[in-house]
Amino acid sequence: MIVKWGDILDSRANYSYVAQVNICKTSEFFKYNITYPVLKLYDKYVYHDMYDREIIININNEICEDVMEFKNSVKKQAIAYKKRYTEKLSKSDEDYVKYQYEVYINNEVTYDRNNIISIVMTKYEFTGGAHGMTYLDAYNYNLLTGDRLTLKDMFKPGVDYEEIVNNFIKEEINNKPENYFKGDEGFKGISENQPFYIDEDGIVIYFGLYEIAPYYIGIPKFKLKFDEFNKYLNYN
């Protein structure tokens, strides 16, 4: 699928805007605080022939379903932990560590024009142990078609984007090799469904915690700046 961005120097505002929904709750063994985005059409475009309301509905449903699936997965673990904790406490005089399972989700709209939107969701879970885990989920859409964009879509047809991106990341890693795993645990190349998001000046490739670097490094990110990679990218 070809992405029709439009010239970034002559950008066009999208026909939709992003509202935020917050849900939160605290109980004995589980708490969550979640803010997730909801796309809405500007009033003047609600009945415009060019824009399909179903596209917005489908995008919102996909994002909401992902958020609830993440929350409910941790909630299910919290229920199981509560049962184990209660059973142990009733059978022993010993003290057991009691803690809450936690979910925090927030988001940032990093790009929103030229019929393209990019939203980065930061998801955190704590399920016991030394620390919680943080995940990034990026939602990149063509708002005219409803298609969820892949990294390949960002590049012109015929461009070997995998080679370009892999070489760039390898160069960045070589600049600070002490920050990354080596050998079999290190970076071997981007995946077919490589996560990324778009911001105002580039395309950000990212990896999960522990994927190519130690936990203390955080989520590794590598930005292909528009002004450096423009000749490869899929602009009109």
Language-model regions: role of each:
Residues 2-236:
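Compositionally biased intrinsically disordered regions enriched in Thr/Gly
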